[in-house]
Structure formats: structure tokens, C-alpha cells
Amino acid sequence: MTDWLDEIEPGAPDAVAAFRGIEAGKFISVRREVRRRAGPGSAERVVAQLGAIAQALVAIVEALPEPAFAAPGGEGDWNVAEAIGHDADSRAGLAMAGALAATGKFPPEAPSVVPGIPGTRGLGREALVRRLGASQRIVERAGRSIAGHEEEPCPLEHPQVGRLRCGEWLLFAAVHDLMHLEQLHGIAEALRSEPGGGQPGASRRDGAEPGGSEPGGSEMGAREALRGEHGGGEPA
């Protein structure tokens, strides 16, 4: 059992419960947990859990040495800064999609989710911390709109995940956060174990983007199918 996941579980129990299905390579159990835990009255609770995860993301961003942000980020050919920026954009975009659907404002012409959009290249520590903070503020506003509408359908379409309900997208954003938090902990561990200029992230990769050919068996397939990447294609 992963130490970092155990540490965050008290503050984000629903997200961690769903994420553990990914660890076990059980895609169906992840969908089941998301559905079970994102029902009526869940939005406020899930927003708080997204806040706890955002704090954990900020903590690891603040702990990484500056050169790490240009190192391989464990996601295709992205660097660490791009992966973090992508996650910040994704959590905000998924929450916003649920809020738009909950309030009847989801634009009919909105594009589907576009997987594999990296964050802005070249951002440093302070900019990434600000980006994560801004994403959490969007999540909190979206959560207030989703509250009471958790079980309403959302037109957002993901090529691997399909469609989820408004409250389910909010929880899925937290699960997606944990995927990238896992990568960051792997990168931090690589830095600790390879003093003097190792390549953090090169030894801890979750595989190719959805549709890629990176090997990895059933667990890898679950990880790929569950990547709720939502950059560039989010409704506005």
C-alpha cells in the first residue's frame, strides 16, 4: 500500500477509494465507486476532498527542486511542469463541465474531451502553485452549482471514459488528480534515489496517452482508459 496514498486518504476518502481500483487494475470497480460516491449531496464533500488533494499537489510542487520542472514528467514526452499544468487545467475543466450541465448552460456545440493536452511549457514553481490555486477556486464555484444536481446527466464526452453525471465528473477530477500526484511522488523518489543529476520521472512512467502503445497489461489499460485529461477541449 502506497504511503502517500495512505497519508491523503483521511482528507480524500472517496477519491482514494476509486483510485485504488486503478491500482488493482479493476476498471469496473473504479466506475462503480465513482457512481456510488458521487450521488445526491456529494458535491460539497467532494469539493473539500479536491481541496485536500490540491494542497498535496502544492506541497510536492513546493518541495521539488527547480530543475525538476524541466525533467521528464512521466506522461508521454511532457516535462514535469507541463504535467502539473495539465492537471490544473483538467480539474478545473471537468468541474466546470459538470457545473455548466447542472445549470443548463452546457453549450450544444462544445467539443468532446481532447486527451493528451499538456500544460504551458516553461512555468516555474510559483506559477504552477498559482495555477493550482486558481483551479481549486474554479472547483469550489463549480461545486456550488453542482450541489443538488449531482445525478443530472452531463453531455461531456470522453473517448475512453464516456459520459458521467455532473457529480461524477467532479469526483473523477479528484481521481485524475491522484494519477498525477502518483507520478509526482515517483519523480520525487527518483530525485532522492539518484543524487547528482539523475533523470527524475524516467523510471516511473504510467505509460502512453490513451490510444498509445506503451506496454503494461490490464493495470496499464485501466490507467489509460481512466485518464480524464481535459485540456484544450473543455467547454467555455
Kindly label every feature range from the protein language model.
Residues R36-A43, P118-G122, P159-C166:
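A short, mixed-charge helix-start or loop-turn motif at secondary-structure junctions
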Residues M1-R35, A70-V113, E151-G196, A236:
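Short, contiguous alpha-helical
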Residues G39, A43, L50-I53, G76-V80, ...:
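Hydrophobic alpha-helical segments and helix-packing faces
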Residues A48-E62, A97-A99, V113-P153, L170-L171:
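Acidic/histidine-rich alpha-helical segments that form the ligand environment
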